[in-house]
Regions:
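Beta-rich carbohydrate-recognition and catalytic domains
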Residues: 1-121, 125-144
Length: 144
């Protein structure tokens, strides 16, 4: 079997530091890691998408950041548009953020696991049976 690699968008990055520079957050464009692209399922109505023409969501992060970012596109090759760029300078940015608690970034889950410091490398899957998205990510935890 022979495989062929095809670069999208003419070989240009689909997410670039310039996107963050254009919204006044150049530091957020210094590390763009762990991309995960999903094609939106037919069962997700256009009214529930971040934009009616959105067909693809791209999840990514800063390797040492405290939030998971997202961009959307009508075509897998782009152009991609940052999700909620107006929130980049305040709490609640991206699609998942470690909240600041007593001066530290941390989140405690119901099972006692605490994620702190940073989150990165989102791996998003569509669970068609339960009609939901499932995100895995890495971060520092209190478990061994």
């Amino acid at each position: 079997m022979t495989y062929r690699v095809l670069r999208l968008a003419g070989g240009r990055p689909i997410i670039s530091p310039r996107m963050f520079e254009s919204i006044g957050a150049p530091e957020d464009g210094t590390s763009i890691n762990g991309p995960s692209v999903i094609r939106l399922p037919e069962w997700l109505d256009a009214s529930r998408r971040v934009h009616p023409s959105a067909r693809y969501y791209l999840y990514f992060s800063h390797h040492n950041g405290w939030y998971i970012r997202m961009a959307w596109s009508a075509d897998v090759a782009g152009p991609y548009h940052l999700y909620q760029p107006e929130t980049i300078h305040r709490a609640g940015r991206g699609v998942f953020e470690l909240p600041e608690v007593a001066g530290a970034r941390r989140l405690q889950f119901g099972n006692g696991v605490v994620v702190h410091g940073h989150v990165a490398s989102p791996d998003v899957h569509v669970d068609h049976r339960n009609r939901r998205f499932v995100m895995y990510f890495h971060g520092i935890t209190n478990t061994t």
